[in-house]
C-alpha cells in the first residue's frame, strides 16, 4: 500500500543520509576532503 511505499522511501532516504554523513566524517578523519 501507500504506507509501505512511504516507509520504504523513508528508509532509503535515511540510508542515503547516513551514508553521506559517514563519508564526510571518514574523509575528514583521514584528511582527504
UniProtKB/Swiss-Prot annotation:
Compartments it resides in: Secreted
InterPro entries tied to this protein: Antimicrobial_frog_2
Entry-linked Pfam families: Antimicrobial_2
Tissue: Expressed by the skin glands.
Predominant place of localization: secreted
A GO CC term assigned to this protein in UniProt: extracellular region
Keyword presence, Secreted: yes
Domain of life according to the entry: Eukaryota
The keyword Transport is annotated on this UniProt entry: no
Keywords for this protein: Amphibian defense peptide, Antibiotic, Antimicrobial, Cytolysis, Disulfide bond, Hemolysis, Secreted
Coiled coil (residue ranges): none
One Gene Ontology term from the biological process aspect of the record: killing of cells of another organism
Disulfide bond positions: 27-33
Similarity comment: family membership: Belongs to the frog skin active peptide (FSAP) family. Brevinin subfamily.
Function: Shows antibacterial activity against representative Gram-negative and Gram-positive bacterial species, and hemolytic activity.
This protein's name: Brevinin-2E
